Regions:
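One-carbon transfer enzymes
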Residues: 1-165
Length: 165
């Protein structure tokens, strides 16, 4: 049986990507292989992490392409050319439109740094999520893995892990 071909979309340092690479190397991820890393930031350290692991990389710059539609179409072209089965958003700082998400139903996963439905949705990403949680005074936070749909952080929840503050 062929392994599921995974693309990881990133924007920054790639700590979540590194965790996925390590899980693949140790055999925790055994039914899939990270075949491609795509970044919307040409300076993302995640690209270096991928290169060290021998994973193909691509950069798609929305500013250069001029529109969200052109940006997403380019990503879809790359995904299709690489025969990608599953897309993982790991610190990808761009919201994908319905145009994109409907092309990959239940094939896009996101790692969100809170226990959805808290501190999620448009504008809640990266450190802002943690800052808001601390400012609100929550005693427990965590992370959520969910399917991506047209609603930011609105897809079906697959896994949550809580962490005490």
């Amino acid at each position: 049986m062929d392994k599921v071909r995974i693309a990881v979309l990133v924007s920054g340092g790639g700590t979540n990507l590194q965790a996925l690479i390590d899980a693949q190397s140790s055999g925790v991820i055994s039914s899939g292989t990270i075949a491609l890393v795509i970044s919307n930031n040409p300076d993302a350290y995640a690209l270096e992490r991928a290169a060290v692991a021998g994973i193909a990389t691509e950069v798609v710059n929305k500013r250069e392409l001029g529109s969200q539609l052109a940006f997403e179409d380019k990503i879809m072209e790359i995904l299709n050319c690489n025969k990608i089965d599953l897309i993982v958003l790991a610190g990808f700082m761009s919201i994908l439109s319905e145009h994109f998400t409907t092309m990959y139903p239940e094939r896009i996963l996101n790692v969100h740094p809170s226990l959805i439905p808290s501190f999620c949705g448009k504008g809640y990403y990266g450190l802002r999520v943690h800052e808001e949680a601390l400012a609100y005074g929550v005693k427990v936070t965590g992370a959520t893995v969910h399917y991506v749909n047209e609603i930011p952080d609105g897809g079906k929840i697959l896994l949550q892990k809580a962490v005490e503050i």
